[in-house]
């Protein structure tokens, strides 16, 4: 093991051995050996064993090391009890355990995948020539993936490399030239949309009409429906979303849990900001079902959830205990009433196959898309089916769903699982311009995969733009959207968090910019209309592309993301992994959506450390500031409507101070935005605004109308 791989342990040792609590600056000065620091001199810290251990590191490198430990939960940055404005760095229980049993360096190493570029033999080229009528238009790597006779194959397909086309073309090759029976071929995708797209492509070939195209869940659901009487002792069906809501309410009542108090305990003040109680209750409910699913797909009992309570702070213990009660009630209700969730489909199908191996369908060929996203239950299902030939397509660079149970190790360890397998890389990117491909290569160098090559030689517009405030940043993006003379559905605005998405969505509505919001919570596979901008979290946009992409909020707070919209999911995660490396891959996914124009924007002093020096050189060597023209265009957005919104926010702030209440209790931002959009002329009109009930109407109605009419 190289020394550098374990250096993080010395940071943990320093924090644990300090004679008193230290802040971030003092810690960094100690690690770098800054003897001019007054506190170091006064307390003789320069006599400590590890003083200056990182003196050969740059300040940025040491900061990155500390931030990585923070992001992986090994240290915490907490305010002093007696003075909340002073923060200190402390070891967490997880950090103390890491000192005794180091594992983080193994996680770092396990996210690397050292493979070479695919080699094409002369014999293979001759074969490609003989099938030119069928393979015309494909590159040599694609041709090899389509025609290879290996029984176990992994196709490492980079962003924009045409993986879906290759997968469907391989099926066509097998049925047309290899006498493969279509009904003995199963193609597995991850989404209904991908399944429909694949089925549509295959339907165009007369030899592929009987090929099974399924998602993991749809395949298992068909098995369950076919053998329901053997699996269950009563009729069962998949629970609807409406039923989930009812069951959640029953669980609250059954455990005497007040929804309002549960929300206040479960979510932080920042997480509650700008959300209604109804929205927060929905998030809590979704987390309950996610925890149940996480435990089921990992073959764990909910009883193990209790163990997590003992390993956390008091407030977290209470939340985990509450989560256990709700999850237990929900799961019990569903079992009693013959209701199944998506995780049950796979788990129950696996159990059935284990007990009834003669009912496992036999396939000559099985093809799996998005293999980097598989979880342990899906792998177990593949092992049980055990097809004669297995072809998997995946990209370790785009493994971003570890937080919901996916495991990158399955794609990284494919060769270990199948020693005689063939690994083929698709390294030509057909989506993005050359400069964008160069940029994304440099963003993910640590994964040790071959660089992607760009098929498109034209230059791209790459911009890293800094702003003084988030408001300026959003106004800049909107002004650019209004300038662009391309179909609006060729524009993506991507952000790391739902909060940023909601903020910019409100501004877009105010400007009359039609847009489609995509988030993980929405779970819908909609596509924007030709006159709609796509506004999305990065997790929800994977697999899609656009001419122009804005990645906003490129700061160290968002990439890697310090906050979580799902606090308990983070606490009770069954399998740990390197969160920072997944965040780095997430940033890669965001950048790789762009075809021609890429804007990375941020406010504050520095951009995310994921933008390294090599990336800066590709961009042009520096961060740019908005031009005078950009400032003027953004300034125009401060229209009459914006003035009214500002006046309403001032009124809300003053009212909140007068009544000693949080501003969001007076009125949510979205309610203020809707007031501006509806432009009510009297109090009666305010009745149609969501978020203004009878009490608020009576208390604030006249004041609001007065502000809108120019008074105060």
Walk through the language-model features, giving the residues of each.
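Conserved helicase core region in the C-terminal RecA-like lobe
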Residues: 77, 212-222, 366-370, 393, ...
């Amino acid at each position: 093991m190289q020394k550098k791989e374990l250096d993080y342990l010395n940071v943990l040792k320093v924090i644990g051995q300090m004679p008193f609590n230290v802040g971030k600056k003092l810690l960094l000065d100690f690690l770098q050996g800054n003897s001019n620091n007054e506190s170091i001199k006064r307390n003789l810290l320069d006599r400590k064993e590890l003083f200056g251990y990182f003196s050969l590191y740059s300040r940025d490198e040491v900061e990155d090391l500390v931030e990585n430990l923070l992001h992986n939960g090994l240290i915490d940055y907490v305010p002093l009890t007696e003075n909340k404005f002073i923060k200190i760095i402390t070891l967490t229980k997880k950090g103390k355990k890491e000192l005794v049993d180091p594992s983080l360096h193994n996680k770092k190493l396990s996210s690397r995948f050292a493979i070479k570029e695919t080699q094409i033999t002369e014999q293979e080229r001759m074969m490609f020539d003989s099938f030119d009528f069928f393979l015309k238009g494909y590159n040599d790597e694609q041709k090899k993936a389509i025609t290879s006779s290996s029984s176990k194959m992994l196709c490492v397909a980079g962003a924009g490399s045409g993986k879906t086309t290759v997968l469907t073309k391989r099926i066509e090759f097998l049925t047309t030239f290899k006498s493969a029976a279509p009904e003995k071929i199963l193609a597995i995708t991850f989404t209904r949309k991908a399944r429909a797209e694949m089925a549509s492509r295959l339907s165009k070939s007369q030899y592929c009409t009987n090929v099974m195209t399924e998602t993991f869940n749809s395949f298992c659901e068909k098995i369950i429906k076919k053998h329901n009487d053997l699996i269950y002792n009563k009729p069962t069906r998949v629970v609807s979303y409406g039923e989930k809501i009812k069951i959640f309410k029953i669980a609250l009542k059954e455990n005497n849990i007040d929804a309002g108090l549960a929300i206040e305990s479960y979510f932080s003040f920042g997480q509650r900001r700008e959300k209604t109680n109804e929205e927060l209750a929905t998030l809590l409910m979704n987390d309950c079902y996610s925890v149940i699913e996480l435990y089921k797909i990992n073959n764990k009992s909910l009883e193990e959830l209790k163990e997590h309570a003992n390993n956390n702070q008091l407030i977290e213990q209470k939340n985990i205990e509450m989560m256990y009660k709700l999850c237990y009630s929900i799961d019990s209700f569903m079992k009693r009433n013959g209701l199944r969730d998506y995780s049950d489909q796979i788990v129950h199908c696996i159990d059935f196959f284990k007990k009834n191996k003669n009912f496992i369908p036999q396939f000559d060929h099985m093809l799996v898309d998005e293999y980097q996203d598989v979880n342990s239950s899906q792998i177990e299902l593949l092992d049980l089916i055990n097809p004669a030939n297995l072809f998997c397509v995946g990209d370790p660079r785009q493994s971003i769903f570890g937080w919901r149970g996916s495991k990158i190790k399955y794609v990284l360890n494919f060769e270990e699982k199948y020693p005689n397998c063939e690994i083929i890389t698709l390294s030509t990117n057909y989506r993005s311009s050359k400069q964008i491909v160069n940029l994304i290569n440099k963003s993910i160098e640590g994964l040790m995969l071959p660089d992607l090559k760009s098929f498109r030689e034209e230059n791209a517009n790459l911009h890293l733009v800094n702003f003084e405030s988030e408001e300026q940043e959003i106004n800049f993006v909107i002004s650019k959207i209004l300038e662009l003379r391309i179909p609006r559905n060729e524009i993506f605005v991507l952000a790391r968090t739902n909060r940023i998405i909601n903020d910019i969505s409100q501004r877009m509505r105010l400007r009359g910019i039609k847009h489609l919001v995509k988030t993980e919570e929405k779970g819908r596979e909609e596509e924007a209309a030709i006159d709609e901008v796509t506004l999305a979290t990065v997790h929800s946009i994977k697999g899609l592309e656009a001419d122009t992409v804005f990645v906003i909020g490129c700061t160290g707070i968002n990439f890697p993301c310090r906050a979580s919209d799902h606090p308990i999911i983070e606490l009770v995660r069954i399998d740990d992994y390197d969160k920072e490396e997944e965040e780095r891959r997430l940033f890669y996914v965001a950048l790789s959506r762009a075809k021609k124009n890429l804007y990375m924007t941020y406010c504050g002093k520095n951009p995310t450390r994921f933008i390294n020096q090599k990336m800066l050189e590709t961009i042009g060597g520096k961060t740019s500031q908005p031009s005078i023209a950009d400032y003027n265009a953004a300034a125009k957005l401060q229209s009459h409507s914006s003035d009214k919104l500002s006046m309403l926010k001032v009124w809300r702030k003053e009212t909140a101070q007068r009544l000693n209440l949080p501003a969001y209790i007076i009125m949510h931002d979205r309610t203020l935005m809707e007031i501006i959009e509806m432009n009510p002329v009297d109090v009666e009109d305010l009745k149609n605004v969501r978020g203004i009930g009878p009490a608020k109407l009576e208390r604030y109605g006249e004041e609001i109308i007065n502000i809108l009419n120019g008074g105060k």
